[in-house]
Regions:
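Terminal targeting signals and extreme-terminal segments of soluble enzymes
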Residues: 1-192
Length: 192
């Protein structure tokens, strides 16, 4: 089992209640970084819905207090179950205190015309051709599981135009790209 799979491991207690365990090796500052929390909430929702025709369509996530080491409950509440779309709220809690919560909409695929056409072409430089960022002690603890690749950087306040950072990131030990793993990745790129 890869480190990310271990971090996103859930034990089902009831159909809507799961247990997870936060560990210090995923810390960023005072607690587990938000991507792990988001990944756990996505995994609990996916397990609760138990329908592969449904996929996440929208989501907001709120971090209420530091997610410190130890066991936590992940609780799913169905707000509305529909034939094509369902709305849920997922909570990560410890001793009846909310650590983080997420509102989600999960829906079936719909056939529809695209309403947005990008006005510029994105050219992705292969990661083998850009800087592989070395791990340094000042990085958050969880970065030992992540590899960053930096293509370009224009820091603020240096007169270099609009600030931007462009590159890639991935887990060093890869895992299939599931919705929970993708959720964990959403918060790992340092400008996030």
């Amino acid at each position: 089992m890869t480190p990310i799979d271990q971090a996103l491991n859930l034990t089902q207690k009831t159909p809507s209640l799961y247990e997870a365990h936060f560990t210090k090796d995923w810390y960023q500052g005072r607690g587990v970084y938000g991507g792990i929390q988001l990944g756990l909430m996505l995994k609990a929702a996916e397990t609760f819905i138990n329908d592969t025709d449904f996929a996440p369509r929208s989501m907001t996530c709120h971090y209420c207090e530091p997610a410190t080491e130890g066991p936590v409950d992940v609780r799913v509440q169905m707000l509305r179950a529909g034939k094509t779309i369902s709305h849920l709220q997922v909570f990560i809690e410890r001793e009846d205190k909310v650590i983080s919560s997420s509102l989600m909409s999960w829906g079936r695929q719909r056939d529809m015309e695209a309403v947005h056409t990008p006005d510029d072409q994105r050219i992705l430089v292969p990661k083998k051709d850009i800087l592989k960022v070395p791990h340094v002690d000042r990085m958050p603890v969880f970065c030992k599981y992540v590899q960053f690749y930096l293509e370009s950087m224009s820091p603020p306040y240096l007169g270099m135009g609009e600030p931007s950072i462009k590159g890639y990131c991935e887990f060093i030990e890869s895992s299939p790209l599931t919705f929970p793993v993708l959720g964990a990745m959403l918060d790992m790129w340092w400008p996030s």
